[in-house]
Amino acid sequence: MKKILNDPYQYVDEMLAGLCSAHPELYRQAGEAGRVIARSEKIKNGKVGIVSGGGSGHLPIFTGYVGQGLLDACAIGDVFASPSVDQMADAMREANGGAGVLRLYGNYGGDVMNFDMAGEMLEMEDVESSTVLLADDVASASKQEREKRRGVAGMGYAFKIAGAAAEEMNNLNEVTRIAQKTADACHSVGAALTPCTVPQAGKPTFEISDDEMEMGMGMEMEMKAR
C-alpha cells in the first residue's frame, strides 16, 4: 500500500498538527505531548464534558467526532496503541466545564486501564467523572460474555447521542444514563475488505484475496471469536 509520509515514526504527531492547522476553527492541540485534540472554543461553564480516545489508525474515530454536540476532547495514541494515562488526563482537563466529565470509549484493555487511572488522577483534582464502555461488536464474544465484546461502530452513535444530551446541559448522571442506554442498544459486526499496512511495519498485517472478505475482524485486525 502506497503512502505519502515524511517519517513513519512521526506521522501521528504530524497528522494531528496538520489537522489543527487546516481547521483551526474546529480543533486545537492540547496536552504536554500535543496528543489531545480539543474543540477550538472553550467549553461552556456548567456543561458536562465528554472525552474519548484510543489508538491512531481508525479515522474518523476519534478526531472526526470532536465538535459541538459531540466530543469535547480526545486522547490519541500511536497506531493501534492506547494513549498514556497523562494524555487521557489532559483530555479530561480540556473537557472539564465544572459539571463533570464522561469517559466514553471502546472496551479495550489498555484504554480501560489508562482511562480508569486518569479518572483517579482527576478525582484528586476534584473533577467528577463517569465511564460508559462501548461493547457492540457481536463477533468478538458471545452474548453470555458481552462484557468482553469490543467497541467499534457503536461509538459513533454514542458520541452523537451523549454529546447532544450534554449540549442540552443535562447533568452528569443523566448524560451517563443516556450514553449507557445507547451503548446497550448498539450491536455491530465488522467486515474487512483489504488488509491495512501499519506505517512502521511497511507491509500488510494479513492477506486476503480480491474475491474475499473477513467477517468479524476488529478495528486493530483482531480476529473474531471462534
Sequence positions of predicted segments:
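Short glycine-rich or small-residue beta-strand-to-loop segments that form or flank ligand, phosphate
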Residues: K2, V48-G55, L71-C74, G100-G109, ...
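Generic secondary-structure signature for well-ordered alpha-helical cores
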Residues: A17-R28, L71, A75-I76, R93, ...
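Internal, active-site/partner-interface "lid" segment
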Residues: S140-R149, F159-E220
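A structural-propensity feature for long, helix-poor, extended segments
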Residues: V85-N107, M113, A141, R146-K160
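Short, acidic/small-residue loops that bind anionic groups at enzyme active sites
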Residues: C74-V79, E123-K148
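Gly-rich Lys/Arg/Thr-decorated short loops/hinges at beta-loop-alpha junctions or inter-strand turns
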Residues: N45-G53, F62-A75, A139-S142, M213-R226
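N-terminal amphipathic/basic leader segments beginning at the initiator methionine
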Residues: M1-G49, D210
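Glycine-rich oxoanion-binding loops at beta->alpha junctions
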Residues: H58, G67-G98
